[in-house]
Amino acid sequence: MTPLSMSGAGEAQIIKKIGGKEEVRSFLEKLGFVVGGEVTVISEIAGNMIVNVKGARVAIGKDMANKIMV
């Protein structure tokens, strides 16, 4: 497993684990980041990422991307 922040643009990944405190995991789940779900990195600039999850584009910071393991 590696953090989502290490994935390159255009790579579809399956979410294997979501770390962090309960409120962080709950927040990410509401955005569509769930274990077993697919996430694709659209772009990455200075550690901040735009990803496609459940058909929607979502911007997340590097700290959040580090909590999502693929």
Locate the predicted segments by residue.
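Compact, glycine-rich, soluble single-domain proteins
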Residues: M1-V35, T40-V70
